[in-house]
Regions:
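Post-HExxH zinc-binding segment in Zn-dependent metallohydrolases
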Residues: 88-111
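Hydrophobic (often cysteine-bearing) scaffold residues that line and stabilize catalytic clefts
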Residues: 12, 69, 92
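Catalytic zinc-binding patch centered on the HExxH motif and its immediate surroundings
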Residues: 35-56
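Zn2+-dependent metallopeptidase catalytic core
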Residues: 8-29
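Hydrophobic or amphipathic, alpha-helical segments that drive membrane association/targeting
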Residues: 2-8, 32-41
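Membrane-anchoring alpha-helices and their flanking helix-loop junctions
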Residues: 38-41, 82, 101
Length: 111
């Protein structure tokens, strides 16, 4: 199940999720909740937390549309990594950063 709060980004968030599920079928195996929140003080655009099969993505609530897409893609890659059991932080970030812009462009070009 995929839940995203915040009316402004619900449709876009669902579109990104559906796009990513076609590439990362593991995403359909877990519950994911996306929560827009002010992350200014944390100096990040987003992060992912895992509890059992529940994955919570907090994403900064004042991003441009493209930054929102890129950040959600990045964090959904982390959810897939959690499902795959990839725990090494350096490898996780290397993979997510290496794919986020390519996947963002693929998503934007399909629209």
């Amino acid at each position: 199940m995929f839940i995203i709060t915040g009316k402004k980004i619900t449709t876009l968030g669902n579109e990104v999720y559906e796009f990513m599920c076609r590439l990362y079928p593991n995403l359909t195996e877990v519950d994911i909740e996306v929560i827009p929140t002010d992350l200014t003080e944390d100096n990040v655009f987003g992060w992912t937390m895992e509890t059992d099969d529940q994955h919570e993505i907090e994403i900064h609530n004042d991003l441009s549309e493209k930054d929102f897409i890129t950040t959600l893609i990045h964090e959904l890659i982390h959810v897939d990594q959690n499902v795959r059991g990839l725990l090494d932080d350096e490898e996780r970030e290397k993979e997510a950063y290496s794919l986020e812009h390519t996947l963002t462009n693929q998503f934007l070009n399909k629209c």
